[in-house]
UniProtKB/Swiss-Prot annotation:
It is found in: Cell membrane. It comes from Lachnoclostridium phytofermentans (strain ATCC 700394 / DSM 18823 / ISDg). This is Ribonuclease Y. Residues 332-425 form the HD domain. The gene is rny. GO terms for biological process: mRNA catabolic process. Endoribonuclease that initiates mRNA decay. The keyword Secreted does not apply. It is a single-pass membrane protein. Its EC number is 3.1.-.-. Belongs to the RNase Y family. GO terms for molecular function: RNA binding; RNA endonuclease activity. Pfam families: HD, KH_1, RNase_Y_N. It comes from the Bacteria. Residues 206-269 form the KH domain.
Length: 516
């Protein structure tokens, strides 16, 4: 029963819901239909308005198109007129140019015709001139007795002789003028420098003499079975010569430092009176220390005398060793001091750094202090030493260039070379061995005799002048100037010599006849 009631309620609810839904649908349909009708009406109004607007714009667009078309048409007509006018002007210019070109072409054709005529005339004249030239040459050859080639050679030789003469005269004039001016200035500088410098001359020797209180001392120096003299010779490297010379012992050796060490040691032994191997060894050791001290003191004294400071202590010691070195009889240390002083004086006259000039002059021969201990020339050794002890590039170049091995890089190097030459070349500064002297003179004569046209030559004035006799038929007066110049250059390049050598070329013609 309850179930039936529930079912009846459910069915009733469903029916009520269906009725309500249907009513809602009907109401909504009416509302929608009302809205649709309203929308259709508005749509028709909008369409009508749009049609009216479109018609208006269409008419406006047609009007604008017509106006633009008319404007474009007018512009095209204007441009067409302008182009036609420009084309007409261009045609006129072309016509004018064509007329001008025609006139020029006509004138050119006339000129070409004239030119052809002139060329023909020139060809005719050229043939006539050539024929005339051949006739003249033949006539000249007939008159002079020379062919054209011979005449050319004669003319060339004549011109060459004239040029040689003018060249020789010009060279002589320029050399004379340059020499006068250079010699005047150089003499002023050198004379001033030499007047302010005075240096000693030391004769080269390989022996030293030790005076003895009496001849009995000779026996004590020799010792039992000669052991004393052998010990002294072994320790010093010097030969002791004991002969009939009264109260004297001669020390002979080529190393002056060893000879000086032996002299001091022997004098100490003589004063002490105790002469035996142990005492000799002790005295030699003392003498070596004394000589080393003397070397350093001499080096310091040299730097003080010249006025050069800041030199490396080892270079100062090597300067001191140069006191015991000689070259051709000239003491190496005295020579270096003299070069330093002269370099400073010359630098002061010229106006360059006096301090560096003195320094370079003092060190220019530093390699001579050890050239007997090391391989190489004293120049290269000196350069290596200066580089090792941080000398300036100017000083190094002066050391390297003072014998002409390299080019000068500063005025200082030129000054040092000049001072070195002055010191070495002054009278009495150096002496040569007889063999070296004669070889140098022979070399000088051989060099001059090797030139064409030289008959004989004589080296005179101790090799400071060479007189060259030439064959007069082979060497003219003008050739003498060139020959003297060539001889000077040859001597400079092949011969080593102190100072200058005067080249005197002599051309002499002699005619001999006899009166009968």
């Amino acid at each position: 029963m309850l179930i039936k009631i529930v079912i009846a309620c459910v069915i009733t609810a469903i029916i009520v819901a269906l009725i309500a839904w249907k009513s809602a649908i009907s109401y909504y349909k009416k509302v929608v239909e009302g809205k649709i009708g309203s929308a259709d009406e508005k749509a028709r109004e909008i369409i009508d308005e749009a049609l009216k607007t479109a018609e208006t714009k269409k008419r406006e667009a047609l009007l604008e198109a017509k106006e633009e078309s008319l404007k474009t048409k007018n512009e095209l007509e204007r441009e067409t007129k302008e182009r036609r006018a420009e084309l007409q002007r261009y045609e006129k210019r072309v016509l004018t140019k064509e007329e001008t070109l025609d006139r020029k072409t006509e004138a050119l054709e006339k000129k070409e015709a004239k030119l052809v005529a002139k060329e023909q005339e020139l060809d005719r004249l050229r043939v006539e001139v050539e024929e005339s030239h051949q006739k003249q040459v033949a006539e000249l050859e007939k008159i002079s007795g020379l062919t054209s080639e011979q005449a050319k050679e004669y003319l060339i030789k004549t011109v060459e002789d004239e040029v040689k003469h003018e060249t020789a005269v010009l060279i002589k004039e320029l050399e004379s003028r340059a020499k006068e001016e250079a010699e005047k200035k150089a003499k002023d500088y050198v004379v001033t420098a030499i007047q302010k410098c005075a240096a000693d001359h030391v004769a080269e020797t390989t022996i030293s003499v030790v005076q003895l209180p009496n001849d009995e001392m000779k026996g004590r120096i020799i010792g039992r079975e000669g052991r004393n003299i052998r010990t002294l010779e072994t320790l010093t490297g010097v030969d002791l010569i004991i002969d009939d010379t009264p109260e004297a012992v001669i020390l002979s050796g080529f190393d002056p430092i060893r000879r000086e060490t032996a002299r001091i040691a022997l004098e100490k032994l003589i004063v002490d009176g105790r002469i035996h191997p142990a005492r000799i060894e002790e005295m030699v050791e003392k003498a070596q220390k004394e000589v080393e001290t003397m070397i350093r003191e001499e080096g310091e004294a040299a730097t003080l005398e010249v006025g050069v400071h800041g030199i490396h202590p080892e270079l100062v010691r090597l300067l001191g060793k140069m006191k015991f070195r000689t070259s051709y009889g000239q003491n190496a240390l005295k020579h270096s001091i003299e070069v330093a002083i002269l370099s400073g004086l010359l630098a002061g006259e010229i106006g360059v750094d006096v301090r560096i000039a003195k320094r370079a002059g003092l060190l220019h021969d530093i390699g001579k202090s050890v050239d007997h201990e090391m391989e190489g020339t004293h120049v290269q050794i000196g350069v290596d030493l200066c580089r090792k002890y941080k000398e300036s590039p100017i000083v190094i170049n002066a050391v390297e260039a003072h014998h002409g091995d390299v080019e000068f890089q500063s005025l200082i190097a030129c000054i040092v070379q000049a001072a070195d030459t002055i010191s070495a070349a002054r009278p009495g500064a150096r002496r040569e061995t007889l063999e070296t002297y004669t070889n140098r003179l022979k070399q000088l004569e051989d060099i001059t005799n090797g030139f064409k046209g030289v008959d004989k030559s004589f080296a005179i004035q101790a090799g400071r002048e060479v007189r060259v006799m030439v064959v007069p038929d082979q060497v003219t007066d003008d050739d003498m100037v060139l020959l003297a110049r060539d001889l000077s250059k040859k001597i400079e390049s092949e011969l080593e010599y102190p100072g200058m050598i005067k080249v005197n070329v002599i051309r002499e013609s002699r005619v001999t006849d006899y009166a009968k």
